[in-house]
Structure formats: structure tokens, C-alpha cells
UniProtKB/Swiss-Prot annotation:
Bias (Polar residues) ranges: 306-322
Cross-link annotation Glycyl lysine isopeptide (Lys-Gly) (interchain with G-Cter in ubiquitin), location: 84, 94, 130, 175
Residues covered by the WWE domain: 91-167
Region: Disordered, residue numbers: 259-359
Protein name: E3 ubiquitin-protein ligase RNF146
Keywords for the protein's UniProt record, in alphabetical order: Cytoplasm, Isopeptide bond, Metal-binding, Nucleus, Phosphoprotein, Transferase, Ubl conjugation, Ubl conjugation pathway, Wnt signaling pathway, Zinc, Zinc-finger
Function: E3 ubiquitin-protein ligase that specifically binds poly-ADP-ribosylated (PARsylated) proteins and mediates their ubiquitination and subsequent degradation. May regulate many important biological processes, such as cell survival and DNA damage response. Acts as an activator of the Wnt signaling pathway by mediating the ubiquitination of PARsylated AXIN1 and AXIN2, 2 key components of the beta-catenin destruction complex. Acts in cooperation with tankyrase proteins (TNKS and TNKS2), which mediate PARsylation of target proteins AXIN1, AXIN2, BLZF1, CASC3, TNKS and TNKS2.
Organism: Ailuropoda melanoleuca (Giant panda)
Domain of life: Eukaryota
Subcellular location(s) per record: Cytoplasm, Cytosol; Nucleus
Length: 359
């Protein structure tokens, strides 16, 4: 059996109310709280990194922002460690949430309140009982100022970011203690990293965003262009025609119907056979639409026929006007010459063809 001298106990690890020579009286050593190498104090809610080094949870949190590595061995800290920390004593967290006194101190988070850790709560309670207007706190490597008059806290070097604090009873609903959630289910959810060193809850609303269904765009009805069904994203076959031709086609559609009423159904040419002009292909709007509706019609032929139809709709009025002017000019020349004069008047059509009218 090992003697008292063989047990390696330092005086600093023993409680303060015990002497060194009394260590042999009770050979069973008491559990000691490890010290944090970052804040140089006893660990509050100690956590163990994958490298087996132990620190305060908030100290690891503050150090991970400066560099995601262990403060001692420089081994990398996992990304999800702050969301799923390895606590050395999980029961200590539940005991801290129940508290030892009647009141506790809280700071504001999103959708709830967080309870301060025991050390910070003692400092706040001591300053409040002494009637101080403010006190400083070291949290996660940052110095915070607690304004006990306005009940807010802020970083000493950044006064713009303020957070509400309050002193309330110990058993109010809370989110957790010092950034550690009390519910076990929250540890299984991959939460976003918190934005402040004091454990403020800044979880982004990822679940809300995932539940929002994407907007379903309503489909526009298919439109018919020359007998072909086209969607809004599909270009029409007559996309090469100009806007003026389309506008003229709409304006002259009423005139063409009126002309058909006194020319007769099926009459498309306005000139007589004796005009001497080479007749154009006998195509009508109805024929163009019927040809375009067939699947075997080529797209280029459809465009050519469509443009030719538009030109033919513009020709009758122009030819009639030119013929009237030619007749009048021929009559004037015959009267002025005192006899019959055969004058050939040439008029130019929009499609480049010329018509000769004999007087």
C-alpha cells in the first residue's frame, strides 16, 4: 500500500482550509476544478477539445474567433465544436441554471434571455448590492461594461453595440447559460456561429428559410403566330419582319376586308391582265396561314410569304393612285399637244417592280 509520501499532491491543489500535514488523514483526493490557460482562472463550464486540452467554454469561443486553433498546441478546432461542445460536467450546467440564490442575472438574446455564468453573476450582484453605477466584466477575452443604471452592457472599446441586461428570479424561462443551451435537442441541430463573445444567440433563421417553398411561376398561355404555337420564350418565325410592317398589317386589315367586299371573294389582283406587268404569285393571307400551319413548310418560306403578303396589302391603294395620276397626266399631254399622244408612264411599286400604263 502506498504511503503518504508517494502520493503526488501539491499544496495548491488542496482546499485552503486544510494544511499540508493533514493530507495523510484522508488519503482519498478531492476532485479539483482545472484551470484555464486563457483566462488564468478556474474553468467555468470546462470543455475538452479534441486535443484533450481543457478551457472555459467562453474562452474557447473567444479564442476561436482569433484563430480556430488550440491556445496551447495550435491544433485546429472543429467548426461545429461551439455548437456541440464536449462538457466535462454536464450536470454542472443544469445546476447552474437552477442557481444557488433567489435572483440571477440575464442578458438579452434573440427570442429569449441567457443567464450569465456563475462568476459573472457574482460580480454583477456584488456591484449591484454596493450601489455601483457600472462594473467591468471579462467575457471570452473581451472587456465588457455593465451599466447598472440603464441596464445595458457593451464592449469597452465599442459603445455602439448594446445589449439589455436584467436581474430576475432564478426560475424564469431561459435559453441557457452563457451560450450553452439547456435543451439537448438543440445540440443535434447545426446552428450558426454566434456573433458576440458573451454567448448571444444569433442563430440565423435557416429553418424558416428552408420551409418557405419556392414561388411557382405561372405559365403564360401559348400564343399562335401564323398557325404555330409559340411560348413567350420561343421566338416567332416572323421575328425578322420590322415593327412597321406589323403595324401596317394591323391597320390595313380592315381595309383589305372592305376591298374584298366589292372586289369579290378570291380576287386578289387589282390590275387588269392588259397591264403588261408580270403577275405575282397568287397567294392570299388565308393561303399563307394554311401553309404555315402545316408541319412540312419551311421557316424561311414562311417568312418570305408573310413579307410578300404584307407588301401585297400595301400595293392596291398605291397602284390605284399611280394609275389615276398616269391617266390624268396622259390626258393633259393629249390636250396640250392638240392630238392623241401615246405616253408611257412608269410607276414604281414598293417591291421593286415597275408597271407601264398605256394611254
Amino acid at each position: 500500500m502506498a504511503g503518504c509520501g508517494e502520493i503526488d499532491h501539491s499544496v495548491n491543489m488542496l482546499p485552503t482550509n486544510r494544511k499540508a500535514n493533514e493530507s495523510c488523514a484522508n488519503p482519498a483526493p478531492s476532485l479539483t476544478v482545472p484551470e484555464c490557460a486563457i483566462c488564468l482562472q478556474t474553468c467555468v463550464h470546462p470543455v475538452s477539445l479534441p486535443c484533450k486540452h481543457v478551457f472555459c467554454y467562453l474562452c474557447v469561443k473567444g479564442a476561436s474567433w482569433l484563430g480556430k486553433r488550440c491556445a496551447l498546441c495550435r491544433q485546429e478546432i472543429p467548426e461545429d465544436f461551439l455548437d456541440k461542445p464536449t462538457l466535462l460536467s454536464p450536470e454542472e450546467l443544469k445546476a447552474a441554471s437552477r442557481g444557488n440564490g433567489e435572483y440571477a442575472w440575464y442578458y438579452e438574446g434573440r427570442n429569449g434571455w441567457w443567464q450569465y455564468d456563475e462568476r459573472t453573476s457574482r460580480e454583477l450582484e456584488d456591484a449591484f448590492s454596493k450601489g455601483k453605477k457600472s462594473t467591468e466584466m471579462l467575457i471570452a477575452g473581451f472587456l465588457y461594461v455593465a451599466d447598472l443604471e440603464n441596464m445595458v452592457q457593451y464592449r469597452r472599446n465599442e459603445h455602439g453595440r448594446r445589449r439589455k441586461i436584467k436581474r430576475d428570479i432564478i426560475d424564469i424561462p431561459k435559453k441557457g447559460v452563457a451560450g450553452l443551451r439547456l435543451d439537448c435537442e438543440a445540440n443535434t441541430v447545426n446552428l450558426a456561429r454566434e456573433s458576440s463573445a458573451d454567448g448571444a444567440d444569433s442563430v440565423s433563421a435557416q429553418s424558416g428559410a428552408s420551409s418557405v417553398q419556392p414561388l411557382v411561376s405561372s405559365l403564360r398561355p401559348l400564343t399562335s403566330v401564323d398557325g404555330q404555337l409559340t411560348s413567350p420564350a420561343t421566338p416567332s418565325p416572323d421575328a425578322s419582319t420590322s415593327l412597321e410592317d406589323s403595324f401596317a398589317h394591323l391597320q390595313l386589315s380592315g381595309d383589305s376586308i372592305a376591298e374584298r367586299s366589292h372586289r369579290g371573294e378570291g380576287e386578289e389582283d387589282h390590275e387588269s391582265p392588259s397591264s403588261g406587268r408580270v403577275p405575282a404569285p397568287d397567294t392570299s393571307v388565308e393561303e399563307t396561314e394554311s401553309d404555315a400551319s402545316s408541319d412540312s413548310e419551311d421557316v424561311s418560306a414562311l417568312v418570305a410569304q408573310h413579307s410578300l403578303t404584307q407588301q401585297r396589302l400595301l400595293v392596291p391603294n398605291a397602284n390605284q393612285t399611280v394609275s389615276d395620276r398616269s391617266d390624268r397626266s396622259g390626258i393633259d399631254r393629249s390636250v396640250a399637244g392638240g392630238g392623241t399622244v401615246n405616253a408611257g408612264v412608269r410607276s414604281r411599286r414598293p417591291d421593286g417592280q415597275c408597271t407601264v400604263t398605256e394611254v
